[in-house]
Amino acid sequence: STLANKIVDCIKNDSNPEGKFLHPVSKFNQHLCFTGGEPLMITGQQAVVGIYNELKRQDNLPGSMTFETNGTQKLKPEFIEWANSIDTEIFFSCSPKLFTVSGEKPEKAIKPEIVAEYAKVSSKGQLKFVVGEKDREWNEMEEAVAKFRDAGVDWPVWIMPTGAREEEQTAGAGKVAEKAFKRGYNVAARVHVYLFGNAIGT
């Protein structure tokens, strides 16, 4: 209940003094995103269920929930049972790390069988890859996409240009976007960087 109350406190402001997900001004039922770190570690899965149950007890549920994950964490049976029992939409945003970009070894980072489990829990999701202009990065990304497709994951693919700072993104983002569109992928920008800079808490 402490974590749920902290989340409610975070969305309190002058126009939403009680911290309601159903915003009193826009009348829009807002979204709750679990990010990290890695929110689908075993302790994270347990915490999410507790947070949801407490928000439900307070009659203050979000319109939908997203899990921002690297797609390597197996779902516990208890989490799957809970996810299948609730009416709130669950969305998985999976961002597998590429060796050519992050140095993460493929056998650790690319887990199609695990992401396929997520897709069975919810048809709502996406695969998101951080990619630059280099051909080897694109080749690795498309090899990974093929593995996810073979496992039955048919979520859309989003490409996020490399670069944590706005000037880094601006330098190559156009070329990355052009490549993505030609290959039938979507492009994701780091909007928070444009708005607030690469600062903690944004």
Where in this protein do the model-derived segments appear?
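Conserved AdoMet/S-adenosylmethionine-binding subsite of the radical SAM
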Residues: L22, K27, L40-T202
